[in-house]
Amino acid sequence: MSQKSVNAIKVLGVDAINKAKSGHPGVVMGAAPMAYSLFTKHLRVNPKKTDWINRDRFVLSAGHGSMLLYSLLHLSGFEDVSLEEVKNFRQWGSKTPGHPEFGHTKGIDATTGPLGQGISTAVGMALAERYLAAKYNKEGYDLFDHYTYVICGDGDIMEGVASEASSFAAVQKLNKLVVLYDSNDICLDGETKDAFSENVRARYEAYGWNTILVEDGASVEAVNAAIEQAKKSDKPTLIEVKTIIGAGSPNRQGTNGVHGAPLGEEETALFRKEIGWENEPFDIPADVYADFKANVADRGEGEYAKWEKLYADYKAAYPELAKELEEVLSREDIKRLSKESFSFKNVGEAQATRNSSQDAINSVAAVLPTFFGGSADLSHSNMTFIKGDNLQDDAHRTERNVQFGVREFAMATVLNGLMLHGGVRVFGGTFFVFSDYLKGALRLSALQNLPVTYVFTHDSIAVGEDGPTHEPIEHLASLRTIPNTYVFRPADATETQAAWYLSQKTNDRPTSIVLTRQNLPILENSSFEKVAKGAYVVYETSADFDTILIATGSEVALAIDVARELEKDGSKVRVVSMPSVELFEEQSKEYKEELLPLNIRRRVSLEMGNSALWYKYVGLDGLAIGIDKFGASAPANKVIEEYGFTVEAVVEKIKNEL
C-alpha cells in the first residue's frame, strides 16, 4: 500500500503543476517517499484541529516544492486543501499558492520559499517547545512534548542562514528537531558539485548534530528507521536522504530539467507508465485516501483526544498554572499590560533611548510570563538583558535571555519560529546598521503577521568614532517600505515606553524600535498616549503658526531648539514628533490635516537619515533636512556638527532656503 500512496503523492503533484503550467515537480517526485514515511508513521497532527499547540510542527524549507505539501495535506484530510484547491494550484485566490503561506492555508506551519529560512524557523519552533515544556510540564503531565520536522534541499543547506541557525541549534541541544535533507545532487543551474562540494554530514557533526545517512531515499522503511533513531538522540538530527530528483520520469529524472518546469503531457504519460499509474489526472484511488485517513488523520485525532484528557486533568491538578497557560496561549495576558506597567523619567532628565528600552523590556517581562529574547552578541550595547534572569540553554531552559551569537539573520528567523509556535512573545536586538543582515526574516515576520519586536540601537551618525560602516543612513527608509510593519523612532524615554507598549499590544505585524546610543532629554510635552497616533504636536507657542517642523528620534529635541531660535525672528512654529510614520498613515484624513494643515507650506523635516520619504510631508516646496551620503569617523558631536545637525546650521538652512 505504501508504494501506491507514494505514487499518489507524486502524480497529484505532477498533475497540479501541469495544470498550472508552473511549478517544481522534481522535489515532489524525489521526496515523496520520505514525506510519506514522516506523515504516516511519525507526524502527530489533527486535520480537524490545526491550531493544536502540541501538534508536531512540519516545515517544508524547500518551499518551491509546495505541491509535495499540498498533496500530503489533501490526502490527509485537511479541509483547506480540497481536490478543487489542488487543481487551482498557483491561481488567484486559491488556498494553494506557489509557496506555502502560514495563515493563508490551515495546515501550513510556516511561510517558506526563501531558501534556508525554513530550517532556521524550525529551530525557533523547537526552542519554543523546549521552553514551554520546561515551564509548564509537570511530572505525569507532558503538555508539551512534540517534535519539529523539516524537509530541506541542497539549496537550503547552501544558504548561510541555515548554517547560522544550525550552529545555534547545536549549542542549544535542540534534540526534538529533525531535519530530513533531500540530497539529490541537483540544483537549478545543474549539478551541485559545481558549486557545493563539502561533506554536509561532517559539517553538521562539527556543529554538534547527530547525523544519519539513508542511502535509498525511495525506501519508506529506511526513512522510518532513521527517524526512529533520530528521536533517541540528545542532539538535533540531520538525516541525509539520498534521492533522485524527478524520480520516475524516464527522460528527466536526475537532471536539473525537472527542477522548476512542468513535465508536460508527453513526459507525464511516460512517467505514469513507468510507475504503473492508470488513473486519470486528479483521480486518487479510495484505498489511498483510506491509508492516509488511518495513518495520519485517525491517528492524529486519537493523539489529540489523549492530550485533551491530559490537559483537563492538568487543569484540575494545577489550576493557577493552567489559567496562566491559557492566557498565554490566547494572548489574553497582554491585557494586563498598561501604561502603569512602565516607569517614567522626569522632564529635564536625560537618558539614551536604548536605556529607556531596557527599562521597558524589564517592565514588560514583569507582566508577561513567557516574554523573552536576546541579542546578536550585543546585549550590553543594545540593552536587551532581562534582569533577574540568566542565559537560556539546555541546562537552564526557562531563563529568559537568549544568546544568539553574531548571527543576526538566524536570530530573526528563530524569533519567527518562536512566534509561529505560539505561547511566547519575543524580541531580538542588534545595531541598526546590521538590520540589513536580517531583513529577509523581518520581511517574513511581516508576511506572516508575526508580532516580533526588533530592537535596533545606535541609530544614526551619532555613533561617531566607529564610522560609516556602523552609521545607518538608508536603513529607516528601507524598513519603512516593508508592508505590514511598524517602525518607531522615539524621541525620548516616554515615547520609548509607548513604543514598547504598542509593540506588545500589536498581534498582526512586527515592530522595529530604533534607538539612540546618546542621551536625549525627557521632553516637556512628549506623550505616551499620543504615540499611538504616530505623530503629534510636541511644541507650539501659537495657534496661529506659520511654520511646521517634523522630526523623529534625537532630532525632536533639536527641532524644538530650532523653533525657539526661529521665533526670535518672528516665526510662529509648530513642532511635530513623528515616532511612527506607519501609525500616522493609519489616522483619519481629518487628524492628518489638523496636524499638518494644507495651508501651511513652510515645512521642514529633520531626520539623520535618508531624506526621500519626507517630501511626502513637506512637499516639493518644503525642506527635507536629512543625510544622503555615508557617515564618517570622529567623535559624535563633531560628526553631527559637520553634517549640519546643529541649531545654528538648521536655522541658517531654513532661512536661506525657505
Placement of each model-derived feature along the sequence:
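Thiamine diphosphate
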Residues: 91-103, 121, 127, 131-135, ...
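Short glycine-enriched loops at secondary-structure junctions
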Residues: 89-95, 375-381, 388, 406-409, ...
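Cofactor-binding active-site loop characterized by glycine-rich and histidine/acidic residues
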Residues: 30-172, 385-386, 414, 418
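A glycine-rich helix N-cap at a beta->alpha junction
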Residues: 78-88, 171-182, 205-209, 446-461, ...
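Acidic-glycine-rich active-site phosphate/pyrophosphate-binding loop
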Residues: 1-10, 43-45, 82-104, 379-393, ...
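A short, small-residue-rich loop immediately preceding and capping a beta-strand
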Residues: 20, 56-57, 108-111, 141-159, ...
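Conserved acidic/glycine
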Residues: 1-31, 151-152, 156-157, 178, ...
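Short, surface-exposed connector motifs at secondary-structure boundaries
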Residues: 51, 147-148, 208-211, 421-427, ...
